[in-house]
Amino acid sequence: MRGRLQGVELIARDWIGLMVEVVESPNHSEVGIKGEVVDETQNTLKIMTEKGLKVVAKRGRTFRVWYKGKIMRIKGDLINFRPEDRIKRGLMMLKRAKGVWI
C-alpha cells in the first residue's frame, strides 16, 4: 500500500528536478528519452537529456520516474494538468491512481 501512496504523492507534486524516462509513446522516437525534468507545462515535460533539451507531451505516454529511491511508472494522462492544479487536486488523484505501478 505504501507504494500506491507514494505514487499518488508523485502525481500530485511538481516534477521539476525528477529523473524520468519515456517508456511508452505513440511516437516511437520518444521512447527511451531519459533525463531530468527542467520545466513542466499543462501538456508537456521539458527533459534535459545528454543530447540536449527534449519536449515531450504528457498525454498518451507512460513515464518511468525515479522518486524517493523507488522507480515508478506513471501514465502521462494522470499528470496532464498544470502542476499547480495537480497539487490542489491531490485528493482527486487517489481515485485516478489506477495508472500507478511500482
Swiss-Prot record:
Gene3D superfamilies listed in its UniProt record: Ribonuclease P/MRP, subunit p29
Source taxon at top rank: Archaea
Assembly behavior: Consists of a catalytic RNA component and at least 4-5 protein subunits.
HAMAP family membership: RNase_P_1
Purpose of the protein: Part of ribonuclease P, a protein complex that generates mature tRNA molecules by cleaving their 5'-ends.
Family: Belongs to the eukaryotic/archaeal RNase P protein component 1 family.
Name of the protein in its database record: Ribonuclease P protein component 1
Organism (species): Archaeoglobus fulgidus (strain ATCC 49558 / DSM 4304 / JCM 9628 / NBRC 100126 / VC-16)
Phylogenetic classification of the source organism: Archaea, Methanobacteriati, Methanobacteriota, Archaeoglobi, Archaeoglobales
